[in-house]
UniProtKB/Swiss-Prot annotation:
Disulfide bonds: none
Needed cofactors: a divalent metal cation
Organism, scientific name: Laribacter hongkongensis (strain HLHK9)
Catalytic activity annotation: 4-CDP-2-C-methyl-D-erythritol 2-phosphate = 2-C-methyl-D-erythritol 2,4-cyclic diphosphate + CMP
Binding site for 4-CDP-2-C-methyl-D-erythritol 2-phosphate: 10-12, 36-37, 58-60, 63-67, 144
Pfam families according to UniProt: YgbB
Cofactor, how bound (note): Binds 1 divalent metal cation per subunit.
Name of this protein: 2-C-methyl-D-erythritol 2,4-cyclodiphosphate synthase
């Protein structure tokens, strides 16, 4: 049995005039994440974890922020494409665990919706996808409310014989 672990991380600055999207869920807040795409840090971290576990590079290699094709892109679409590429490389996704770090807004009311969206995008049952919401206890740039970060790990299993 060939198992692979991948780890992903992303952070984006909070700015006025943009919607806040995490895990494909639009969250009511006076600021949103700044980025080339919709800046969904949670989807980006999971996408990076998948690519890393499959040794396929990272999100920037596949969806560069210098490419206008991805300007304003829905990160769930990018995640689904990452899933397709990982499966094409011969891997099945076993599970995903993730953490969003944000001082504000309070994310707990949205975690189950995020989990549901992500499970659908990953082609997994929700019991194989976990989303946790944490604060940084008012420490650093995240604690000052300057941005939001996300971490993710995934486990892949190869369908190929070694």
């Amino acid at each position: 049995m060939n198992l692979r672990i991948g780890q992903g991380w992303d952070v984006h600055r909070l700015v006025e005039g943009r919607p806040l999207v995490l895990g494909g869920v639009t969250i009511p807040f006076d600021k949103g994440l700044d980025g080339h795409s919709d800046a969904d840090a949670l989807c980006h971290a999971i996408t990076d974890a998948l690519f890393g576990a499959a040794a396929l590079g990272d999100i920037g290699r596949h969806f560069p922020d210098t490419d206008l094709e991805f300007k304003g892109a829905d990160s769930r679409v990018l995640l689904r494409e990452a899933v397709r590429r990982v499966r094409e490389a011969g891997f099945d996704i076993v599970n995903v665990d993730s953490t969003v770090i944000a001082q504000a807004p309070r994310l707990a009311p949205y975690v189950e919706a995020m989990r549901s969206h992500l499970a659908a995008d990953l082609g997994l049952s929700p019991d194989r996808v976990n989303v946790k919401a944490k604060t940084s206890e008012r420490l650093g740039h995240l604690g000052r409310g300057e941005g939001i970060a996300a971490d993710a790990v995934c486990l892949l299993q190869s369908r190929l014989q070694e």
